[in-house]
A protein has these predicted regions:
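A basic, amphipathic helix-loop patch mediating RNA/tRNA/ribosome contacts
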Residues: 2-36
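Fe-S ferredoxin-like electron-transfer domains
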Residues: 29-173
Length: 173
């Protein structure tokens, strides 16, 4: 789509220039599109194009779905944009502005404070994690360490080393 000038928003996709690695987990669902002949919306990052495929990227249904997905992600995210170091350079903040999200219609799960961990090579603040899985892709496919993965389920899901160990105790470089 971007090759022909169509902007489809995404949070989980990352194209690591200079490598053959692409992160297309379809985990964020911000990139949903309508595909003719399909009942459900499809994630653009994980949908292979075929000859004659008709894809609609900005219908009312698509835009409403993207806004709801952004609202759901924000519902489980700290409301501290003004004090966040990424303020003004944050993809999630940009999407909230794009979809004119001013109030939170959803309340995320009641979670206890999540881990914040700093090592010599990485700062890991799980309060900011939106489960895009970019870090997992870089760890597994670029660094080829395999130290990170999704553990637990539902609101308890987190991206962490096996058995929820600390990064300093893992194979992380």
């Amino acid at each position: 789509a971007c090759k022909i000038g169509i902007n489809i928003p995404t949070l989980c996709h990352i194209d690591l220039k200079g490598t053959c690695i692409k992160n297309n987990p379809a985990s964020c669902r911000i990139c949903v599109v309508e595909v003719a002949g399909r009942r459900n919306l499809a994630p653009a990052c994980a949908t292979r194009c075929t000859e004659g495929m008709v894809v609609k990227t900005s219908t009312l249904r698509v835009m409403n779905a993207r806004k709801v997905v952004a609202e759901l992600i924000l519902s489980d995210h700290p409301n501290d944009c003004l004090t966040c170091p990424k303020c003004g350079n944050c993809e999630l903040q940009t999407l909230a502005l794009r979809f004119n999200i001013r109030e939170m219609p959803f309340n995320g799960g009641e979670l206890s404070p999540r881990k914040r961990e700093v090592t010599s090579s990485i700062v890991r603040n799980m309060d900011k994690c939106i489960f895009c899985r970019r870090c997992e892709s870089v760890c597994n496919d670029v660094q080829t360490v395999g130290a990170l993965g999704a553990i637990r389920r539902g609101f308890n899901t987190t991206i962490a080393p096996a058995f929820d160990r600390m990064m300093k105790d893992s194979e992380c470089t």
